Curated annotation (Swiss-Prot):
Location of the protein in the cell: Cytoplasm; Cytoplasmic vesicle membrane; Endosome
SMART domains assigned: BRO1 (SM01041)
Listed Pfam families: ALIX_LYPXL_bnd, BRO1
Protein name (record): ALG-2 interacting protein X
Species annotation: Dictyostelium discoideum (Social amoeba)
Keyword Coiled coil set for record: yes
Comp. bias regions, Low complexity: 698-712, 723-742, 749-764
Consequences of knocking out this gene: No obvious effect on unicellular growth but induces a premature development arrest, with an inability to differentiate spores and to build a true stalk indicative of a major defect in differentiation and morphogenesis. The abortive structure contains a mixture of undifferentiated cells and vacuolated stalk-like cells. Differing results include abnormal development only at very low extracellular Ca(2+) conditions (below 10 nM) or at alkaline pH (pH 9).
Transmembrane segments annotated in the record for this chain: none
Amino acid sequence: MLSIERKRTEKVDFSKPLTKYIKEQFSKAESDQHETQIATLNGLREDVRNLQERTETSKEMVWKYYSILSSLELRFPISENNVRISFPWTDSYRQRKSTLYSIYFERASVLFNYGSIVSQIASSTNRSNIEGVKKACNQFQLAAGVFNKLREYASLHPECSTSADFSSESLQALVTIMLAQAQECIYEKASMDNLSDSILSKLAAQVAEYYDTFNQLLNSNSLKSIVDRNWNITATVKSYLYKAISLYCHAKGLEQVSQFGEQVSRLMIAVDNINQSKVNLAKTAPIELKEIVERYVISITRYCESAKKDNDTIYHDTIPPAHKLTPIEKKPLAKALPLPEINFVDPFNSLVPFSVKEDSAYYNDQKETLLRKELDNIEFHNQSAKASLLSMGLPGSIEALDVGVPVALKEKMNVVTNEQGVSNITRLLENIQQLSDEDSAICLSAGNLLKKEEDEDNLMRATYGAQWHRTPSYTLTANLTQDYAKYTSHLQHSTKSDSFIRKKFEDHKNSIQELENQTEIIALLPTNNLPSGKIAEIASLTVLMNDLDALMANRESIAEKLKNLCKKDDITLKLLSPQKDKSLIYAEEIQKYEPLQMSLNESFLKQQKLIEDIRKENEKFTNQKSKQGNQREEILQKYANAYKVYNELKANLDEGTQFYLNFQEILNKFLNRCKDFTTGRENEKIELKRQIEAGVNPHSPLTSPSPSLQSPVNNYPNQFSSPQYHTSPNQQQQQQQQYVPSSQPPPQYSYNPQPYQPPQQFGGPLPPPQSFSAPPPPQSFTAPPPYNSNNKHY
């Protein structure tokens, strides 16, 4: 088997050109951050350059370097007039060197060497057993795919044709010889598997044709003077060999259908071909090839002589001339395999120009808009279908026909019974009340601290008059009082929502309780007698409803596919390519969503027809329903609603519990902020009072505040310390402007409280301290609402 020699190269340094480009186009910080990646790139190229072994490890190393070059090609304009990096490479045939300032030339050369290593692995594989033949075949087909991809790539970058092995004829010849040898492996495996002579004949005929084509390409003007002469010899020998094998196998099949004259004619041609194969064998030909040719010379010659003798003495069948024989059908099974996926950690993935990021963001907006539109369409049609069924009393009216408790209701009852429905909701309500009380207590404690501090400050100011010259509390606590008012408001809303949930539970408590008693429900359900002649209508209606369920389930599956596609859809690398207009890229890439969109549109149209068919069948069905059936249906609907409310209550209470737990963390932090502030103010109060009573002038520049006055809360992030006593009023005013504590909003929960007052047992809303004058929230702040007690859809 033939393999391809690798191209050779010299050492190349990426460091200076790439570092300079990154620094100029991005920043020095970016260039510093990529020093390691560039050094690794240099090292990887050296490893690839010095490869000697033909192993899977070598193959993977070359592929890794080729993959990284794909990133360089997109991000660095490596050319003679821009980022100047010269790449010297010899051609595979004569080892003549070409040097180009082209990343395309470098990438094409590395891909060539990848194909070369693959071909060498294939040709060196032991094919004495089936597994070896299969491995060699797979590698030859992969090599064909590599050289085919290289032919396409080189055609897009004409500068690559500087190297003789990158000409169109050269690369086509390499694809052909790889396919020829892969087809040869397929023939060998078929022979090992003892397949029919007819199949073997067709496979061998295709091998011969591939070698003929390869020979013709080698004799083209651009290749005949530079390729190894042994390639022509091998191609000629194998072309004759497999023509002979094809004729030989076909002739054996003719004996089975008593076409003895044609059999002799084909065997005579086979003898000529196998002799030509032997004549063209070079002395340097591999021993394995010589043995194969010699073996077939003997087999075909003997079989031909035996067939001629039998025909002359027994059959006397006319031997047709060669030109009247029908050509043997060829069976090409070898095919060029696609290249492996480029799957690597891109060392330069952060080097994306801002303009490309904007273009990528624009496309992301397009796909997100498309996704939202389709998801909204799915939701609309699903809800529309459910509403249509509900308006027709379905599926309740069908379930009402079951004897005893319908399966769907039994399942609901089992859920409620296993969860101890009423007890479960009662426990959750008690738990949420406890959490609400705890949150309220924390918030009230914080408010009391602030009020107490302000009252004491006002008392000191009234007692000492002008001597009590420090910043008033209300000035420093503006943000704290604002947060207190905001948190108090949230607790008020939350208690209203809790009240609504409790009332909802009380309204449906009995029905939920009954769901835990199957015997009682069975006793309540009247029997439903339907004329036997209407069983067909029921069956038809059930089938249509099942079809509708399947349709909606399929839409949900399509929705998931859309989400996954949208999540993985990143076209940044494609936008980096200068070869294509971005508007064309947008148009092409968004098309990948069209098949799923078409499936959805077909589903929506099908739903319209299904709903109409269900409506017609339901009209036939409802005309025959009995009075008992209607009563039964009403009872079943009642318990279906009770189960729905039970699930809503669980969801509301779980969400409320999470809200109170998260809110408690925020309130505790707020309480600590208030404690820090009031502690610092208390220390200041004590020291200032001591100085006044000692007769020390607090404004004297000689007076140094005690350590306790050194901003006792400065170590905390909000810095609620007041100004020092020895500062002037102007200095105090400047310091006051720094005391702007940052607000910490509560967690993000959707909440829509009901418009009525909570009962007294919930503790009622917490009023802010009377002396506070909480300012309204700043315009940039939008307080997130707490949880919504009625925001679930079932």
